[in-house]
Amino acid sequence: REQRRMAGAEALKAIRARTGTAQSAAPAKKVDGKLYKDVKTNCKKVVALACSTGGPKSLQQVIPMLPRNLDAGVVLVQHMPAGFTASLAQRLDEMSDVQVKEAEDGDIIRRGHVYIAPGGKHLRIVKNGSGHKIQLSDEPAIEGLRPCANIMYESLERCDYDEITCVVLTGMGADGTKGIKGLSDRHKKIYVIAQDEDTSVVYGMPKAIAQTGLVNEVVPLNRVAEVITKNVGVS
């Protein structure tokens, strides 16, 4: 037991040290939306993002850099306990041109809006007439995770988006990989962006999806917002 405790302490120390070095990359810049005006117009698009360890700080280099008129809604799963995601959403909203909120059951997914899965809830995206909405549930945790990114991605199998931009940022483990692979297996049109190893606090989740061969672009943290915008455009 003592050996496990010491090993855990060493792992935590390594993550803390890595947090400092990973975030020392050049800061991200706000994306100039005018550069991406005529990108994939007249189609339904969504951005589905997953992150874990190191995610809250990394999201500050992504969400506030997105243009206000991003031509897609953004739904994201950040592994956090209940009670913490509301303050994360508020902080990001204050920093951003896009509107950011903690997701509520029944929220209609709108362009230029970001919805963060509440800690302690699973989040699904479901069809709602000609659009889509958010559905939350208290189902049991999956491999210790609630919210779980795989649940979010798997729900998109039953949606009618023309393209799904999947983004995987820093995090321990492999959450998101199974769900994204499922989208590919069902011939959904996906575009996959993964954070690179150098800027990841923990290169677990991005590595797992990269190893599937499904990733379209591997980019440093300071380019994630630009690549998202380049792929979905602005309205």
For each of these PLM feature ranges, what is it?
Residues R1-S235:
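Strand-loop microenvironment adjacent to phosphate/nucleotide-handling motifs in alpha/beta enzyme folds
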